[in-house]
């Protein structure tokens, strides 16, 4: 665990070396951060994002699919800033997210259940690093005051987007760390209590479990991204429709599990 953290911190240091760091936060207006605070926050974001993606990599195709969906939501916002608002700095995260999406989509056919190739820690941590780099470049270095107030608002979107895009991995990471600390274990020890394990125990196959988590990722990430270029009421309707479908899909059980339940009752 210490070796992994050291490697992740080194990767964050390389980003800092090339000028990729959080410059300000959209809190109480636009708060310009002192360089030391921005650098510390950058390292923290990198460590959290890398481990969030690494922790979620517990089923065939799960991490690659979630990162592809998260990258798509990031790309929509980055493309808007680069093309519509003309922000030159948004070009780099647009390219990073496009490459990340392509890598994940190309890998998924080989990694979906039953997987023939596994990404392992090195793959999942690299995807986390790519997401962290695009997130910092996109939301930590672009002036939110330039975003139209007719949309979600200049103070909210850059703050909400990274959390929305990574909501599922971050939730799983937080719950896992708290659960293991309460049990007196290392936060990096393994267990079978991740979100995907619980969904499978509820009667879902690996493929259906991955699909459920894909849908929840999209349901949280895409409406926030859409709010950057659509009125809030449009985003709300879009979010409501996605939420209704995702809840309906999540409440179902796989056909094989229903057959097994019927046999047990008989």
Show which residues each predicted segment covers.
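Transmembrane alpha-helix boundary signature
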Residues: 1, 16-30, 79-85, 139-146
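Membrane-interfacial loop-to-helix junctions in multi-pass inner-membrane proteins
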Residues: 1-7, 61
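Hydrophobic mid-bilayer segments of alpha-helices in multi-pass membrane transport proteins
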Residues: 5-10, 238-240
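Membrane-embedded alpha-helical core segments of multi-pass
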Residues: 7-22, 41-49, 67-73, 101
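Structural signature of hydrophobic alpha-helical transmembrane segments
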Residues: 29-44, 89-102
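PRPP/pyrophosphate-binding module of the type I phosphoribosyltransferase fold
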Residues: 51, 60-63
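Alpha-helical transmembrane segments
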Residues: 62-266
